[in-house]
Every structure is written in C-alpha cells, then in structure tokens.
Amino acid sequence: MSIKLNALFSDSYVDVSQYRDQHFKGNRYEQEKLLKQSATLYVGNLSFYTTEEQVHELFAKCGDVKRIIIGLDKIKKTACGFCFVEYYTRADAENAMRFVNGTRLDDRIIRTDWDAGFKEGRQYGRGKSGGQVRDEYRQDYDPARGGYGKMVQKS
C-alpha cells in the first residue's frame, strides 16, 4: 500500500510522537489508544510569563477550545512553561498540531504533542525543585524561563 493511501486508513493525519507519559495509569496499549482519540494537546517551551489569554488567542484559530490548563510549579504555584489545551473535537486538535506546532508565541518557539487527556495533578511540574525537569539542568540563561537551570543556580 502506498504512503498516500495509508493516510486514508489511519486514525489521524497527524502522527503520535514517540514520547510517552511515564506516570500514565494503565498499559501502553491503553495509552496509545487514548492518544489516537484525544482532543487534548500538551504545549511546551512556553515563557513563564505567557498568559492563558495568549494561549487561547493562538489556539482558538484552529477550533473551539474547551479549556486551557496552565502548568504550575508545584511548590510556588506559578507558571512553569507548559500547558494543556483541550478542544471539543479531535479535528480541531489535529489542526492545531498541523498549524501551531513550531510557531512563535510570546517570542518563543512552542511545541505541541498529543496528550492522553488531562487528569487532576498533572498541571504541576515534576522537577525536584517544583518546575519542569528540563529546566532543572539547563546551562544557558533564559530570562523567559526563570534564568539559569535550578541545579546550576545551586552550584
């Protein structure tokens, strides 16, 4: 079967990435199934200062947004550079994956990925210092993400 025809038989025209949530409650098959049906996106590389309104303005261009959950530092309860965007339909979420991934928001190139669906508690960063793990060890200075990485600041 040709590559073009494969798209006709797939669940989605937007591929699911290799990333899997290590804290997912269930087996890999269940997670894959949810990812292929989901209307929820993970959005990463946001500035700590990006507002929910800015996220909504961008993502609403692709369809009706059900809700936005801003990721929070689990200790400080301040934004920590990611969010979840829920759409009412898979088709609208696919549009966002196609057209928003890799674009600029608040002077940062953002990335989107499928999410199996938001569950309470997932809005908190999983890093040791409360934020995102990727911000723990960052060597470069990034004012939009709190300066240097948390572990570098402690050295």
UniProtKB/Swiss-Prot annotation:
The family database entries (InterPro entries) matched by this protein are listed as: NCBP2 (IPR027157), NCBP2_RRM (IPR034148), Nucleotide-bd_a/b_plait_sf (IPR012677), RBD_domain_sf (IPR035979), RRM_dom (IPR000504)
Q: Where in the cell is it found?
A: Nucleus; Cytoplasm
Which residue intervals are annotated with compositional bias (Basic and acidic residues) in the record? Answer: 133-143
Binding-site residues, mRNA: 19, 42, 111-115, 122-126, 132-133
Q: Which SUPFAM superfamilies match?
A: RNA-binding domain, RBD (SSF54928)
Q: Which UniProt keywords apply?
A: Cytoplasm, mRNA processing, mRNA splicing, mRNA transport, Nonsense-mediated mRNA decay, Nucleus, RNA-binding, RNA-mediated gene silencing, Translation regulation, Transport
What Pfam families would the database entry show?
Answer: RRM_1
Task: Give an example GO molecular function.
Answer: mRNA binding
Q: Family per UniProt?
A: Belongs to the RRM NCBP2 family.
Protein name per the record: Nuclear cap-binding protein subunit 2
Q: What gene name does this entry carry?
A: ncbp2
